[in-house]
Amino acid sequence: MIGSHYNSENFNCAHFVAQWYSDKLCIEIPVVDEFELSFVRWMRKHFVKIDKPENDCLVNMQSDNNSHVGVYSDYGVYHNYKVGKSKGSVVHWELGVVMRNYKKVTFWKWSQ
């Protein structure tokens, strides 16, 4: 998955998370065109917030006007990241890098 290119319509951060959960955990997450409020509402119904990250937990990252989602594993966060007009791709960031780049970071564990 690392290196898979970002596409806002076909493979954005929510698509990546849905693929991760489907491939690794056999959990189907609805895919949305872009990460939006409806996904957050769905997430809060099916995940429980946890204080510390655990392998395969969902990571919700927020900055001023943006929400972003990834998955915690291998002591960091895998996420499909795009800056400006770059192509973007799936990357793995250490947790400290995530915390420095986003104002609010929360962790969510599958609850069903």
Protein language model annotation of sequence segments:
Residues 2-54:
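Catalytic cysteine-centered active-site loop
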Residues 1-2, 87-112:
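Non-catalytic ligand/cofactor/substrate-binding and regulatory segments of enzyme domains
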Residues 5, 20, 46, 77, ...:
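Intrinsically disordered, low-complexity N-terminal regions enriched in serine/proline/glycine
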Residues 32-87, 91, 96-97:
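...with weaker cross-activation on analogous glycine-rich loops/strands in unrelated enzymes
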